[in-house]
Amino acid sequence: SILIFYLCSDSNQMERKIIQTSDGSSSVYLPEWDENYHSKHGAIQEAYHVFIKNGLDLFQDGSAIQVLEMGFGTGLNCMITYLEAIRRDLKIDYTGLEGYPLETKMIFELNHLEQLKAQQELEVYQNIQTSDWEKLAKISSKFNLTKKGIMFEDFHENGVADLIYFDAFGARVQPELWTESIFKN
């Protein structure tokens, strides 16, 4: 494991470690909360099972879709959605919300592109990770990304999603994100 300290945007220092999950993909572990960013069984496996198989796959090939991710985290779900969009000729407008963005340096230490066998998409991955927050980024002709540095409970835009990736930490560590008011919003 690589031990890295980063300063969160709330000015509280939080330790983060890069770990390997069972499918070989890396993830981030927060010792203070005893919580992983992804399933210990596999970061990539989880993303495909939860967000693609049970979300994006419900839309027909060639569709135009607005995706809202609550918990942008490492950007893995965004990258996998991009890869699926290319494969299925989808037009995606992707909005990612993140209250505590990870440092780009740490994200580039993750092995997601290798594990996805998508090294040819390095430029796209870099663009996803380094695009400015609060601005629309044209990742490709059919994939737009807006990253917003905002807490879930402070996001109040209506009509911005056909599909929501709710990728919050579990209720054990963030019970405030698992309330009825969050889901009504």
Where are these predicted regions, by residue range?
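Rossmann-like AdoMet
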Residues: 12-65, 82-116
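Active-site segment flanking the S-adenosylmethionine/decSAM binding pocket
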Residues: 142-185
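S-adenosyl-L-methionine
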Residues: 109-157
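Conserved class I S-adenosyl-L-methionine
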Residues: 64-73
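Extreme N-terminal basic, low-complexity initiation segments
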Residues: 2-5
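Glycine-rich SAM-binding Motif I of class I
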Residues: 75-79
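Hydrophobic/aromatic beta-strand patches that form the interior of the parallel beta-sheet core
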Residues: 68, 95-97, 146-148
